[in-house]
Amino acid sequence: MKFYDLMCKAAQDVGLELSKEQYEKFIIYKNLLQEWNEKVNLTAITEDEEIIKKHFIDSIKAFKRDEFKEAKTLIDVGTGAGFPGIPVAIMNENIQVTLLDSLNKRVNFLNLVTEKLGLKNVVAIHSRAEDGARQKNLRESFDIATSRAVANMSVLSEFCLPYVKINGHFIALKGPAVEEEIKDSDKAITTLGGQLLDICEVEIEDTELKHNLVVVKKIKECPKAYPRKAGNVTKKPIK
């Protein structure tokens, strides 16, 4: 029960309770991740303990921000193997989670996980972030856009802020050192209709890892010119 106790402690740290039923869903998720990872590149993290800490607990820590408890709709942009979107959906069944990924094989995996876990509050979409944000049913439609993708804040802001409603939030799950990155993304955040609200440090149980939740509030509409076409966002970040 070591992992259960560890995850319970992590959940309690952010004001949540982890039920046995929720824990069992996480274990099924872990097993599917390990099984599928042998044929589809989903994660470099494959050991039980590492998955629990670096994927599950890291995702649960998003709830340190009350926005994740209060939001009705969330989009996880570039979700990959489903982080943080699926853990968020497991912990809060009142939030409707949209998982967005550009690789069809990963979307197939996400659909399987959603089915096996019986998650009625999750839908997976196959699309590039730049393309999805131009769809009327997705653009400026979510209380939260989140991402744990490996990209700098300027790039992530252009990928994510177009999905956020006015007065909603873009919340990025970042590593330990974000100060310089935040400074460099100031123009991008402002241009895209956002305002930096907070940088919130979180600790991962039973590790020395410290991560940051970067919180951006959407204060005005995103200009129609954004996001730019595929490729331009990463090649020429807004500076």
Curated annotation (Swiss-Prot):
Protein's cellular compartments: Cytoplasm
Gene Ontology MF annotations: rRNA (guanine-N7-)-methyltransferase activity
A GO cellular component entry from the record: cytosol
UniProt entry keywords in alphabetical sequence: Cytoplasm, Methyltransferase, rRNA processing, S-adenosyl-L-methionine, Transferase
A matching Pfam family: GidB
InterPro entries from the UniProt entry: rRNA_ssu_MeTfrase_G, SAM-dependent_MTases_sf
Domain of life of the organism encoding this protein: Bacteria
Entry coiled-coil feature ranges: none
EC number: 2.1.1.-
Chief location of this protein within or outside the cell: cytoplasm
Enzyme kind, highest EC tier: transferase
Binding residues annotated for S-adenosyl-L-methionine, in chain numbering: 78, 83, 129-130, 148
HAMAP family hit by this protein: 16SrRNA_methyltr_G (MF_00074)
Similarity comment: family membership: Belongs to the methyltransferase superfamily. RNA methyltransferase RsmG family.
Function (record text): Specifically methylates the N7 position of a guanine in 16S rRNA.
Protein's UniProt name: Ribosomal RNA small subunit methyltransferase G
Organism: Clostridium botulinum (strain Eklund 17B / Type B)
Taxonomic lineage: Bacteria, Bacillati, Bacillota, Clostridia, Eubacteriales
